[in-house]
């Protein structure tokens, strides 16, 4: 009888000690569950924030959209400035190509004007040697006020990308012959070839808007003379 009593007493004590352990574990599981959504929310927030840091601002001056009316208002057009969807011919026979204006300004073609440059015949030579080419990678230039300005390389007109080209001429060599310019009396004159400039109306950025502005480009190669002193 006493053995049965002790057995029942031990069983009761074991059940009493086990009950608090069960209550202690329950809040722990509940707490773990409550922290999971919070951790997930923080993770999403971190990913969202990280995405903002990685986002890059698009280049502002790349493929700027321009109102076609801006071309119809342009004055002082120069045959040395061309807007085209394709590279212009490199031959000097087409050095007077220009962008079709007014009603034809959105046509993706170019035309040639009659040349006014003298043609050298056999036995005739230039005083200075020059090279002419279309320049389509101009990003900076000096305006008529002497300030550096940003030149628009490409513009978007009616969902078509047009590139701005400049026909530039510069000296090939400051001294085509040992004495300087070709055909100059070296006994009485010092001479050398130099590139000269002119100003043309080009599309540039003014603040946050595209605007026409006079910029300086290379346009000719001339001979500079100075009289030698008497000996």
UniProtKB/Swiss-Prot annotation:
One of its GO terms (biological process) is neuron projection morphogenesis. It comes from the Eukaryota. One of its GO terms (molecular function) is nerve growth factor receptor binding. The keyword Glycoprotein applies. Keywords: Cleavage on pair of basic residues, Disulfide bond, Glycoprotein, Growth factor, Secreted, Signal. Residues 24-53 are annotated as: Disordered. Glycans are attached at residues 63, 107, 158. The keyword Signal applies. Residues 35-50 have a biased composition (Basic residues). Residues 19-114 form a propeptide. It is found in: Secreted. GO terms for cellular component: axon; dendrite; extracellular space; synaptic vesicle. Nerve growth factor is important for the development and maintenance of the sympathetic and sensory nervous systems. It stimulates division and differentiation of sympathetic and embryonic sensory neurons. PANTHER family: BETA-NERVE GROWTH FACTOR, NERVE GROWTH FACTOR NGF -RELATED. This is Nerve growth factor.
């Amino acid at each position: 009888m006493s053995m049965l009593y002790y057995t029942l007493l031990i069983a009761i004590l074991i059940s009493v000690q086990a009950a608090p352990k069960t209550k202690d574990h329950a809040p722990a599981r509940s707490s773990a569950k409550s922290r999971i959504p919070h951790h997930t929310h923080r993770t999403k927030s971190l990913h969202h924030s990280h995405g903002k840091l990685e986002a890059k601002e698009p280049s502002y001056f790349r493929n700027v959209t321009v109102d076609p009316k801006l071309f119809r208002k342009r004055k002082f057009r120069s045959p040395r400035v061309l807007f085209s969807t394709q590279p212009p011919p490199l031959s000097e026979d087409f050095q007077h190509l220009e962008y079709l204006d007014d009603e034809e300004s959105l046509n993706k073609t170019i035309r040639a004007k009659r040349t006014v440059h003298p043609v050298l015949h056999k036995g005739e030579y230039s005083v200075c040697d020059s090279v002419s080419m279309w320049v389509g990678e101009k990003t900076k230039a000096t305006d008529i006020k002497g300030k550096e300005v940003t030149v628009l390389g490409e513009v978007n007109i009616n969902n078509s990308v047009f590139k701005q080209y400049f026909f530039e001429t510069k000296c090939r060599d400051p001294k085509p012959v040992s004495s300087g310019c070709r055909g100059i009396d070296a006994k009485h004159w010092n001479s050398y070839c130099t590139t000269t400039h002119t100003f043309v109306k080009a599309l540039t950025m003014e603040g946050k808007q595209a605007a026409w502005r006079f910029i300086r480009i290379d346009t000719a190669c001339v001979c500079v003379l100075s009289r030698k002193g008497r000996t």
